[in-house]
C-alpha cells in the first residue's frame, strides 16, 4: 500500500533525472496526511536544499505567515510540497524532462491526501495541475485568483492558482494580491460546495468576479 512515508523514502534516494547530482537533500514535502488544503510550489531553493524541507526560506516564511494569519491554520495542518523535489542549479526554472520525471511523486501524494483544495503557487505548478485537469494554461496572471473544479477519481478538488510567494517578497502590489487570494482560499475552505455549484452554473467561479466588481464599485 502506498504511503507518504514510502514516497519520502523514494524521493530521498531518487535518481530519475539529473538533479540528483546537484542536491544536498531532496525535498519530498511535509504536513498533515489528511490535510484539506495542499500547497504546490515549483521546486526547492537553496535553503530548502540545505534542510530537506519545503518553503523554509524567505518565501516560505511569507507563506507560513499567510497560512497562520489569513487562513487561521498552523503550518502542520496543511500539506506543502513542490512539483520537482530537488533544487535546480542556481535556482533556475525546472525543465520539462525534470517535471516529467518527478511529477509522479506529486500525483501519488495527491492520491493519498485527496485534499479539498490544491493551491498552486506560481506558473510551473499551475501549468502542471492544469495539464492534469485538461485546462488550458496561458499565464499565472490570467488564471490566478479564481477557483477551478478538478473532477478527479470520483471526487471534486478545488484548484486555486496564485502567485508564488517569492514573487511577492519585494513587490508590495503582488503581496497585496497574494493576501487577497488567501482570503478567497479561506472562504473556499469554509464553504467549498457553494463554489462547486457556482462553477457549474457560471464557469470559473463567477461569484468571485461579482464580489470583486461589487467591492470595486463601493470603493473598497
From Swiss-Prot:
[4Fe-4S] cluster binds at residues 14, 17, 86, 102. The keyword Hydrolase applies. Belongs to the uracil-DNA glycosylase (UDG) superfamily. Type 4 (UDGa) family. Keywords: 4Fe-4S, DNA damage, DNA repair, Hydrolase, Iron, Iron-sulfur, Metal-binding. Its EC number is 3.2.2.27. This is Type-4 uracil-DNA glycosylase. GO terms for biological process: DNA repair. InterPro entries: Type-4_UDG, UDG_Type-4/5, Ura-DNA_glyco_family4, Uracil-DNA_glycosylase-like, Uracil-DNA_glycosylase-like_sf. One of its GO terms (molecular function) is uracil DNA N-glycosylase activity. It catalyses: Hydrolyzes single-stranded DNA or mismatched double-stranded DNA and polynucleotides, releasing free uracil. Coiled coil: none annotated. It comes from the Archaea. Uracil binds at residues 41-43, 55, 82, 164. It holds the Pfam family UDG. Changing residue 171 to A: No change in activity. Disulfide bonds: none annotated. Gene3D superfamilies: Uracil-DNA glycosylase-like domain. Removes uracil bases that are present in DNA as a result of either deamination of cytosine or misincorporation of dUMP instead of dTMP. It comes from Sulfurisphaera tokodaii (strain DSM 16993 / JCM 10545 / NBRC 100140 / 7). It is an enzyme of class 3 (hydrolase).
Amino acid at each position: 500500500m502506498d504511503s507518504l512515508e514510502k514516497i519520502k523514502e523514494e524521493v530521498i534516494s531518487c535518481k530519475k533525472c539529473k538533479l540528483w547530482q546537484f542536491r544536498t537533500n531532496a525535498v519530498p514535502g511535509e504536513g498533515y496526511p489528511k490535510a484539506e488544503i495542499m500547497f504546490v510550489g515549483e521546486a526547492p531553493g537553496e535553503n530548502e536544499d540545505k534542510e530537506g524541507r519545503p518553503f523554509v526560506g524567505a518565501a516560505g516564511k511569507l507563506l507560513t505567515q499567510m497560512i497562520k494569519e489569513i487562513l487561521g491554520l498552523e503550518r502542520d495542518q496543511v500539506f506543502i510540497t513542490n512539483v520537482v523535489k530537488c533544487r535546480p542549479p542556481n535556482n533556475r526554472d525546472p525543465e520539462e524532462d525534470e517535471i516529467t520525471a518527478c511529477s509522479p511523486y506529486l500525483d501519488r501524494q495527491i492520491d493519498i491526501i485527496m485534499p479539498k483544495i490544491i493551491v498552486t503557487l506560481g506558473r510551473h505548478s499551475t501549468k502542471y495541475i492544469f495539464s492534469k485537469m485538461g485546462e488550458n494554461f496561458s499565464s499565472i496572471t490570467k488564471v490566478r485568483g479564481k477557483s477551478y473544479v478538478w473532477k478527479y477519481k470520483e471526487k471534486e478538488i478545488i484548484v486555486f492558482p496564485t502567485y508564488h510567494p517569492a514573487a511577492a517578497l519585494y513587490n508590495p502590489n503582488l503581496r497585496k494580491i497574494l493576501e487577497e487570494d488567501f482570503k478567497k482560499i479561506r472562504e473556499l475552505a469554509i464553504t467549498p460546495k457553494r463554489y462547486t455549484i457556482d462553477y457549474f452554473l457560471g464557469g470559473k467561479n463567477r461569484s468571485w468576479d461579482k464580489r470583486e466588481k461589487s467591492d470595486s464599485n463601493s470603493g473598497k
